[in-house]
């Protein structure tokens, strides 16, 4: 369904952002902005609205706009398919642990979280919280390698191979950028960002790269020294980095976790929003798309309703990585 709906939404968005009549009205207001006496906020809103139309391609000829809309629709379908493949591959991978050797090093909290009553085993998946916890805690090197490769090789073969999709997306983005007068998709994306250009982004990365690489080499040497006769591998990094942190700084993340319970973090975020922006959050009984969804009525300083804030804080197989709200 998602692969059908997203292209439809893209068509509707393009019908607005590429609309010649609507763009002409925005342009007339923008061209006369100096005489309108706009305040700072309205002036900024006008600037961003005009820019959005320009960057969508509204100023181009009907033929070019038609091509841009067609490319946008195709990209929308491909990016959705890419994300679905990744999600399905993430859901499909399961590492079942049944012996003491296989769960060596895992904390009681983590073992409790991954216990599967039906399978009578501890089951590790590829969602980030489960994956990273296992890679940090597990003493079983071969299982860390298996999980690492399971994560790394998602959507790289068979019907869910994202390689051809990524290539097609890149080609379409390059074609769209050329139609709009940009040297590349990267030039288009970075035009109004801090880096301004691909070269600006690369220059910044190189400033970090040299000292970062030197530090990484030192850390790798330290971790290699911790391996008795074995060669350091990528799947060792999380596990040995945590051991190194404990040795050097006596910093155990498990000891700080009680201070970062969901309730505490959420209360802190709401308090900060109230202090900075005068927002208040009141929990309301609204049915969500999942039983774990919690909704809040958001109001301003005067108590005026601003919107509904719905939180979906817990990882599950059907969610994309990072989709917490």
Positions of PLM-derived features:
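His/Asp/Glu-rich acidic catalytic environments and adjacent acidic regulatory segments
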Residues: 1-196, 211, 291-294
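Active-site-proximal, well-structured secondary-structure segments within enzyme catalytic domains
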Residues: 41, 45-46, 74-77, 84, ...
């Amino acid at each position: 369904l998602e692969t059908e709906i997203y292209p439809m939404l893209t068509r509707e968005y393009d019908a607005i952002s590429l609309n010649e009549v609507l763009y002409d009205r925005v342009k007339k207001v923008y061209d006369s902005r100096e005489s309108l006496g706009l305040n700072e906020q309205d002036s900024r809103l006008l600037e961003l609205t005009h820019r959005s139309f320009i960057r969508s391609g509204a100023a181009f000829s009907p033929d070019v706009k038609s091509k841009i809309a067609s490319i946008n629709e195709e990209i929308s379908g491909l990016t959705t398919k890419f994300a679905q493949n990744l999600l399905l591959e993430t859901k499909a991978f399961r590492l079942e642990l049944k012996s003491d050797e296989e769960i060596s090093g895992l904390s009681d909290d983590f073992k409790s979280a991954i216990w599967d009553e039906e399978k009578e085993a501890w089951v590790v998946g590829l969602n980030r919280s489960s994956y990273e916890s296992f890679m940090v805690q597990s003493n079983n090197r071969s299982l860390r390698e298996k999980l690492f490769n399971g994560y790394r090789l998602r959507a790289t073969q068979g019907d869910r191979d994202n390689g051809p999709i990524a290539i097609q997306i890149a080609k379409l983005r390059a074609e769209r950028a050329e139609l709009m007068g940009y040297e590349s998709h990267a030039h288009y994306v970075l035009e109004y960002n801090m880096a301004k250009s691909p070269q600006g982004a690369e220059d910044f990365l190189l400033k970090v790269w040299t000292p970062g690489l030197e530090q990484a080499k030192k850390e790798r040497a330290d971790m290699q020294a911790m391996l008795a006769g074995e060669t350091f591998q990528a799947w060792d990094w999380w596990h040995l980095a945590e051991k190194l942190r404990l040795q050097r700084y006596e910093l155990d993340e498990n000891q700080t976790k009680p201070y970062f319970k969901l309730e505490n973090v959420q209360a802190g975020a709401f308090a900060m929003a109230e202090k900075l922006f005068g927002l208040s959050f009141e929990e309301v009984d609204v049915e969500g798309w999942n039983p774990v969804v919690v909704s809040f009525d958001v109001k301003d300083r005067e108590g005026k309703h601003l919107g509904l804030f719905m939180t979906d804080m817990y990882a599950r197989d059907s969610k994309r990585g990072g989709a917490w709200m």
